């Protein structure tokens, strides 16, 4: 039962972008709707949990949420350019690399020879996995010469990675508990969502529809907080990376993104390598 709880965040988070695309609207309406959904769910959690608030917790939570909006909005922009099945392995890999390196440099996480070996191997696996998952078909290469969508998508994902990195590490730097940060984060997410999208007139029916992915995201967060004390941070972190399977294969199977046989093989091997790397990083943290 505990492992099942720990897998739920991956299932929930892995399905978010599939819901975003299926529910329609551009990345701006999708971002705004998702943040609103997260706020609604977080208010409900606050009513039942009653976490402790201080000015520091509130401020850190809001800043964290603002940067989550940067990460999510740019991830959705990348999906709009290069698709879910290409965006998500690259995005997940970049997030793992950035958070791991930050953990090593700032928090000195890899303190033993074993953890250093595991960590370095994991980073190599991630890089190889990203390369394999981002293979282009002949048609895509020809289209790239004209539009340059893949290059644009990668640049946007680098910005997204910075957003997600700050979202994750700022709460840790100030030792803010996840339950306490949940509502302030959601408030920051909505503020960030509005600031990043209001010029593009995102307030429409698609923003309302995309409240659903926001509810799903917040539910995934809740199950992460519940599972961590039961299975440990390392295990819950490793299992949460499995969402890449749902989002990537969902992009191909559910959303109908076309791939060549070579690309499919590259994506599958790339996903496996990134998942293995996630497990190795979890072990290196423990």
UniProtKB/Swiss-Prot annotation:
Keywords: Cell membrane, Membrane, Sporulation, Sugar transport, Transmembrane, Transmembrane helix, Transport. Belongs to the GRP transporter (TC 2.A.7.5) family. One of its GO terms (biological process) is sporulation resulting in formation of a cellular spore. InterPro entries: Sugar_transport. Involved in the uptake of glucose. The keyword Glycosyltransferase does not apply. This is Probable glucose uptake protein GlcU. It comes from the Bacteria. It is found in: Cell membrane. The lineage of its organism: Bacteria, Bacillati, Bacillota, Bacilli, Bacillales. Pfam families: Sugar_transport. GO terms for cellular component: plasma membrane. The chain crosses the membrane at residues 4-21, 28-50, 54-71, 84-106, 116-135, 154-176, 181-198, 211-228, 233-255, 262-284.
């Amino acid at each position: 039962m505990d492992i099942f709880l720990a897998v739920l965040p991956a299932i929930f988070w892995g399905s978010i972008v599939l819901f975003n695309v299926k529910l329609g609207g551009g990345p701006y309406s999708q971002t705004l709707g998702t943040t609103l959904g997260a706020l609604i769910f977080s208010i409900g959690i606050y009513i039942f949990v009653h976490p402790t608030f201080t000015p520091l917790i509130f401020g850190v939570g809001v800043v964290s949420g603002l940067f989550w909006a940067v990460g999510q909005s740019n991830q959705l922009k990348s999906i709009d350019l290069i698709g879910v099945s290409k965006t998500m392995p690259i995005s997940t890999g970049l997030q793992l690399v950035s958070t791991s390196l930050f953990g090593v440099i700032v928090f000195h996480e890899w303190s033993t020879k074993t953890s250093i070996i595991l960590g370095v191997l994991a980073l190599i696996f991630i890089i190889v996995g990203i390369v394999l998952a981002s293979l282009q078909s002949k048609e895509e290469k020809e289209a790239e010469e004209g539009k340059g969508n893949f290059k644009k998508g990668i640049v946007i994902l680098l910005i997204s990675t910075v957003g997600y990195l700050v979202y994750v590490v700022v709460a840790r730097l100030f030792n803010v508990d996840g339950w306490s940060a949940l509502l302030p984060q959601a408030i920051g997410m909505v503020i960030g969502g509005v600031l990043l999208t209001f010029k593009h007139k995102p307030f429409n029916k698609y923003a309302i529809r995309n409240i659903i992915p926001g509810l799903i995201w917040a539910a995934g967060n809740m199950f992460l907080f519940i599972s961590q004390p039961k299975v440990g941070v390392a295990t819950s972190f490793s299992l949460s990376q499995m969402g890449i399977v749902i989002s990537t294969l969902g992009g191909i199977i559910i959303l109908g993104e076309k791939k060549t046989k070579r690309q499919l093989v590259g994506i599958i091997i790339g996903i496996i390598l990134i998942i293995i790397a996630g497990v190795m990083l979890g072990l290196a943290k423990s």
